[in-house]
Amino acid sequence: MDRRTLLTRGTVLLGAVCLRSRHAIAAPPLMIEMKGSPRGEAVWFVPVGLAVSPGTTIRFVNRDPGNSHTATAYHPDILDRPRRIPARATPWDSDLLLPGETFEVTLSVPGVYDLYCQPHEHAGMVARIVVGRPGQELGWQDPTAGPGDLPEVALAAFPPVHAILEQGSVMQGRGEAT
């Protein structure tokens, strides 16, 4: 075997090992916290807006010692709510999370995902996750047009998609610094 063949085979083998190990190491989940004021008069997600790549796992953590919360996708299959996630995406509902409990969901379909806390939607406890970027992801889906039957306070709490894409995350919850 000559030197050139040996180097070529070694390079191919090294590349295969590196590629395999890159896929074997999963990125840790990104966290969205559920919070509330000490007396419970205000509740929110932190961050309220988050930009992620397709295939990212989100971990919702209830950090509110005085309340149970949910992380629920807006979708007709869940309490007949309007669909505010991409059409090909699978809806999710964490069920009630007690303080300290967590729930994870992996988002693979590009587009805008709006979610809410079932007991606190009328308090404006909503969040928006943007998966991928428009024009860069096949199958990108903009936010669902129209408010459906969402409370005004919930609609007002969603951060704009462009702000999420520019900043990566938006931290504008009640009681949180902006």
What is the predicted role of each segment?
Residues 2, 7-178:
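Extracytoplasmic copper-binding redox domains, predominantly the cupredoxin/blue-copper superfamily
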